[in-house]
Amino acid sequence: MSDYQVLLYYKYTTIDDPETFAKEHLAACKEMELKGRILVATEGINGTVSGTVEATNKYMDYMANDARFADMVFKIDAADSHAFKKMHVRPRAEIVSLSLEEDVNPLEITGDYLEPAEFRDALLDEDTVILDARNDYEFDIGHFRGAVRPDIQNFRELPGWIEDNRDQLEDKKIVTYCTGGIRCEKFSGWLKTAGFEDVSQLHGGIATYGKNEETKGELWDGQMYVFDERIAVPINQVNPTIVGKDYFDGTPCERYINCANPYCNKQILASLENEKKYLRSCSHECRVHPANLYTKELSKEEFTERLQAIDETLPETVQ
């Protein structure tokens, strides 16, 4: 039995003073020795925290005693240690950043909820468009079979992508999904305000689908990206596969790294071997960038040799 747990949760509810709430909530979390990242806004709370089983259970009880969060659903993952290095509770304008000119309140308008078994049926329906509401790098390490991959790097780019591709979605039955459900609550509501009529969402997100006893994560390929130290977690309990491809050679890969150029910081899938071979950098420009954190640790001679090994050279200004 694991000694730690990771809790994923959200709740759209009114928080009158997010700044004061954040300060008091941070103190409570630290007292329980939790670590994680929580966003609070007037529209609600969105968080992921880790801690011992005892501490996380205490936290769930603590939240249940607040009428605003009494019915909040927690997605619980067993863990061997903390999934975060620190504890942050931050006030924000939104608990998910869609940055609309006219905000959408999921308590007033949102897509129909599909439970895991219903969502699986939708996956098998050729007349249904399954739309991934996550970022491209999340999709690349794992997604539902046949899902549409929007070419976006931030959630706030999704409405623009929809408008650019409206002709492919018009008059279609749309079912959307995300990690835990929070993004789809607002996004599916926006879809309805944007004129799409038949809009549904996976209730509880991928995390709930993967733990459902009926679906057991079936028809999910790869792993689910998470925004903590774990990076990705398994979902499919029936016939797991690897869909991620190494950025450098296209071989199967589920290991994410960040480009060593801090001005880039692009997330790429790469084996340990290729990380070393390509100096943990996504391009030649990033490899020779003066701020590169990986190459700073190399002597000029070693740097030159490593570049030559991949048929590259130092710029004349560096030589």
Curated annotation (Swiss-Prot):
It catalyses: uridine(34) in tRNA + AH2 + O2 = 5-hydroxyuridine(34) in tRNA + A + H2O. GO terms for molecular function: oxidoreductase activity, acting on paired donors, with incorporation or reduction of molecular oxygen. PROSITE patterns: RHODANESE_3 (PS50206). The keyword Disulfide bond does not apply. Its EC number is 1.14.-.-. InterPro entries: Rhodanese-like_dom, Rhodanese-like_dom_sf, Rhodanese_C, TrhO, TRHO_N. It is an enzyme of class 1 (oxidoreductase). The active site is at C178 (cysteine persulfide intermediate). Gene3D superfamilies: 3.30.70.100, Rhodanese-like domain (3.40.250.10). It comes from the Bacteria. Keywords: Oxidoreductase, tRNA processing. Belongs to the TrhO family. HAMAP family: TrhO. Catalyzes oxygen-dependent 5-hydroxyuridine (ho5U) modification at position 34 in tRNAs. This is tRNA uridine(34) hydroxylase.
